[in-house]
Swiss-Prot record:
Disulfide bonds join C37-C51, C41-C60. This is Beta-defensin 107A. Has antibacterial activity. Its main location: secreted. Residues 1-22 form the signal peptide. Keywords: Antibiotic, Antimicrobial, Defensin, Disulfide bond, Secreted, Signal. It comes from Macaca fascicularis (Crab-eating macaque). Belongs to the beta-defensin family. InterPro entries: Beta_defensin_dom. One of its GO terms (cellular component) is extracellular region. It is found in: Secreted. The gene is DEFB107A.
């Protein structure tokens, strides 16, 4: 019975690690698009997609002046 709880805890930890990897991957994509992760974009920035699931959901990019 103790081994069951150990395996269950290990699976929860693995799930957390894989979520962190995808967040890092999304942040790298955002950086390649010359943006940055913020919860709210400034008035002169544009939302270009998701960055992380919970903490900072938006990737912002500065607008180009015409």
């Amino acid at each position: 019975m103790k081994i069951f709880f150990f395996i269950f805890a290990a699976l929860i930890l693995l799930a957390q690690i894989f979520q962190a990897r995808t967040a890092i991957h999304r942040a790298l994509i955002c950086k390649r698009m010359e943006g940055h992760c913020e919860a709210e974009c400034l008035t002169f920035e544009v939302k270009i997609g998701g960055c992380r699931a919970e903490l900072t959901p938006y990737c912002c990019k500065k607008r180009k002046k015409d």
